[in-house]
Swiss-Prot record:
Site (Transition state stabilizer): 349
PANTHER family to which the protein is assigned, alphabetical: ALPHA-AMYLASE FAMILY MEMBER, NEUTRAL AND BASIC AMINO ACID TRANSPORT PROTEIN RBAT
Name of the featured protein: Alpha-glucosidase MAL62
Species this protein is from: Saccharomyces cerevisiae
SMART domains: Aamy (SM00642)
GO biological process: maltose catabolic process; sucrose catabolic process
Lineage: Eukaryota, Fungi, Dikarya, Ascomycota, Saccharomycotina
Gene Ontology MF annotations: alpha-1,4-glucosidase activity; alpha-amylase activity; glucan 1,4-alpha-maltotriohydrolase activity; oligo-1,6-glucosidase activity; sucrose alpha-glucosidase activity
Amino acid sequence: MTISDHPETEPKWWKEATIYQIYPASFKDSNNDGWGDLKGITSKLQYIKDLGVDAIWVCPFYDSPQQDMGYDISNYEKVWPTYGTNEDCFELIDKTHKLGMKFITDLVINHCSTEHEWFKESRSSKTNPKRDWFFWRPPKGYDAEGKPIPPNNWKSFFGGSAWTFDETTNEFYLRLFASRQVDLNWENEDCRRAIFESAVGFWLDHGVDGFRIDTAGLYSKRPGLPDSPIFDKTSKLQHPNWGSHNGPRIHEYHQELHRFMKNRVKDGREIMRVGEVAHGSDNALYTSAARYEVSEVFSFTHVEVGTSPFFRYNIVPFTLKQWKEAIASNFLFINGTDSWATTYIENHDQARSITRFADDSPKYRKISGKLLTLLECSLTGTLYVYQGQEIGQINFKEWPIEKYEDVDVKNNYEIIKKSFGKNSKEMKDFFKGIALLSRDHSRTPMPWTKDKPNAGFTGPDVKPWFFLNESFEQGINVEQESRDDDSVLNFWKRALQARKKYKELMIYGYDFQFIDLDSDQIFSFTKEYEDKTLFAALNFSGEEIEFSLPREGASLSFILGNYDDTDVSSRVLKPWEGRIYLVK
């Protein structure tokens, strides 16, 4: 039912779905080569279904040289052989559907690999028909040593210049990410058509139900690619967002992409589109149903709290109030509109949420993991769960730089070493930053059992592609948690059941109001749906604390909490305790 004053409550499958994100390299290895693969995912579909989720989102499985773990695609229509075959993928889609779940794939179309045939043609000569499918520019000049100077001062998201010099034609190509991850030029209509046909149409024809659209705000660059104003006075290179994010034609491009999808699908299924927009104030424009762009967006505000806007590994202090406001910004904009929101706190680009936002000590890891589950399940929007989050995975501890795999970490390590030295203060700060914030924390292989050395991810005599987080030896694994009724895993199952039972309030709830916003310990709020009110009281501290009622004399009916032995009529919360109530 749609509430007339709240068009956002119009029911849709993709609004009510809980979506489980899979990082294929690290999920499950079926053939003992050390890499996760598509057959491995297929073998665990029942586990995912039993968790209580409704759809899976699989990160890139396409052919790729793997400079950035598959986000550098060399062929959109072929599975990377290490992950399997196209037939393996078609089987995975089919079996996902047979279990009553939807299949969502990653759509990486801001850039492709330099190994893609399109780029090979483009780089071959300045007169090639595909030359304008990418951003080619001559050097701005040459330095005293005769080295070419990049066309502008944009910094790569992964550090260093956003330009790479190519000696084939003595020009630079733009690549906002890794050196061989070259940006596609959406201004070129032939390029757009080819992207739509190869990356989108091919997979729609094979039954996918939706796309997670990678870097969805970057397709329209600032005309002329001018130098960025100086925002970071400590650096000659400037963050590329000013010149590349939410550009003048971005909404036009998403409307065109949506039209292509709608026209391609002939069986009536509704394709969901979640755009990774990251920053900016355009979320309501992107997601308005009347504008036909994307279904919902991922914003980064709440997961970037506590990090520097200039360098993601610089840790800065933050308050609970700041985090609360950042989380709420993900969904407040949809209130009373035809837009929609997402709720997530983990993905393949973020460290583990218990370490980041709760307490990963042995004493409180489990209870604070359940607290984050309560928070996420009580927020309005489409819910996303990232592999390992459901078992309360935490960051790995005290790994040397040699154990890290992420190209972003490796690039910045080399830049800092060259600029400041191996034993500098800057390097020590960098090590603190990656210990808390590195993407690698989310990319360690999934621990299925307690068995050494590989926790059931791959065979015992196989060297996995990436080191396992040693936490599987302390009980953070699927096997042990499945048998433990008090585990984070089984709490997730109960929480997802509650979210479905109370979906009007938990999924579609509107008129969100903070209670005790200024508190640095309590995260509490109310939401409405018709004449019903949900109240959440969550203690984000290691101390007992009393919470305020949503209104004087309110009568509370308990729904769910993360402590079994608690007096739900008491207004005192134990350390890291959370409760969800109906207000009578």
